[in-house]
């Protein structure tokens, strides 16, 4: 018996039945409980959502900037009023501790929406003088209908990161949440409607990426795809978006981010950063600093400090306010992470702690994996090369700065990087050489609304958040005006 009623699609400002008649289940990873049956959208449903978005976008774009701004600001207020309710639902669906979802997921998503709500009236063109009798002006116009495809690790936050700039710029969005964690995106659709967003401007279609995601990516009336997920899937989405109708794309993809701890670093601070960069949200964060480079002279002291902090991790029931480490998001993902851990053991990385599924008592019903630290890792190990997306830290030893930078950059990814040092010149010198789109000095993990987020290399295309993102949800129209005579050559 599912905890919640069957979840429908959200099209045109209301819940509607999927025409497919098919459903899938969403599971609480803490105990295997079926939370709800969720309806699976068909190609016909995608078409309904697109047509609804086309009509809704016309109404939305015709509003004044101040009208749109006020409506989005009202949605921010509702999000904050319902923070605890949404956090509780997010915890059930993702397995994240309630202490985390209450303080991070909805809070940071609402911050992004508030940021873009304030920027709506600032979307403007420019005037370019040509000569006394002629000038050019530009208009920033919405793209039209755009699609967002979300990942399972930050469901409502990602939905807000994608919809906030899209709606602020006057677009309509069709959002497809991950099949694994679909519930809070539907609640966000309710909130937008309650705030006054016109029907059709934010639709939610649930289903698989192979079907619903592909149909959205191919649709000729969709002007842009914003995707968060794995690199291999991102490449397919990008290829389909280009071949179908030359859609614009934003891709926030995988990472294998380096954290370099220099010999002069405060090791207590470095250990705090390393543990947060690997075990917050049970290691399911795309920017995690999973390759931890420590100078040979500091290895033993650093490892001891890391182990001391791992002992403070409170693995438990996500509903318990004292828990700060929950299960992985699903049982299939747990098996994937355990497979990587076995690979690390087989390739002779030295296991400092963890390395197994947690099955004591009630934990045996959930997708729990112990915080795991490997050391004496080599650059060619699978756990060092590939994104694991779980609570697995790899410690690597280096001898000098040039070596650390070279090895840190020796990856197909370039999402994030960080350094810990008390030498300001060294910090900036190293950061300027690191090939990553998001970098931190003496900290890790914060991604405020004002900060553009995105990767180098195979970690993505484009950016989310910040001023630059708003521009990518508009297109520029250039208009020349001639006030004088027109000179024809004929």
From Swiss-Prot:
Q: How does it assemble?
A: Dimer of dimers.
Binding positions (K(+) 2): 246, 457, 460
Pfam families cross-referenced by the UniProt entry: Aldedh
Which reaction is catalysed here?
betaine aldehyde + NAD(+) + H2O = glycine betaine + NADH + 2 H(+); betaine aldehyde + NADP(+) + H2O = glycine betaine + NADPH + 2 H(+)
Q: Which residues carry out catalysis?
A: 162, 252, 286, 464
Task: Please name the source species.
Answer: Pseudomonas aeruginosa (strain ATCC 15692 / DSM 22644 / CIP 104116 / JCM 14847 / LMG 12228 / 1C / PRS 101 / PAO1)
What name does UniProt use for this protein? Answer: NAD/NADP-dependent betaine aldehyde dehydrogenase
**UniProt cross-references to Gene3D superfamilies, sorted A to Z:** Aldehyde Dehydrogenase, Chain A, domain 1, Aldehyde Dehydrogenase, Chain A, domain 2
Q: Which domain of life is it from?
A: Bacteria
Q: Where does K(+) 1 bind?
A: 26-27, 93, 180
A GO term for molecular function: metal ion binding
Which residues fall in a coiled-coil region? none
**Family the entry assigns:** Belongs to the aldehyde dehydrogenase family.
Q: Which residues bind NADPH?
A: 150-153, 176-179, 209, 230-233, 286, 387
Q: Name one GO biological process term.
A: glycine betaine biosynthetic process from choline
Q: Top-level EC class, please? A: oxidoreductase
Location of site Seems to be a necessary countercharge to the potassium cations? 248
Its Enzyme Commission number(s) read 1.2.1.8
Keyword entries, A-Z: Metal-binding, NAD, Oxidation, Oxidoreductase, Potassium
What biological function has been recorded for the protein in this entry? Involved in the biosynthesis of the osmoprotectant glycine betaine. Catalyzes the irreversible oxidation of betaine aldehyde to the corresponding acid. In P.aeruginosa this reaction is a compulsory step in the assimilation of carbon and nitrogen when bacteria are growing in choline or choline precursors. Can use NADP(+) with similar efficiency to NAD(+), a property that can be used by the bacterium to produce the NADPH needed to combat the oxidative stress imposed by the host defenses.
SUPFAM superfamilies attached here?
ALDH-like
- InterPro entries, A to Z: Ald_DH/histidinol_DH (IPR016161), Ald_DH_C (IPR016163), Ald_DH_CS_CYS (IPR016160), Ald_DH_CS_GLU (IPR029510), Ald_DH_N (IPR016162), Aldehyde_DH_dom (IPR015590), BADH (IPR011264)
**Which pathway does the UniProt entry assign to this protein?**
Amine and polyamine biosynthesis; betaine biosynthesis via choline pathway; betaine from betaine aldehyde: step 1/1
Where are the Cysteine sulfenic acid (-SOH) modifications? 286
State the free-text cofactor note. Answer: Binds 2 potassium ions per subunit.
List cofactor names only.
Answer: K(+)
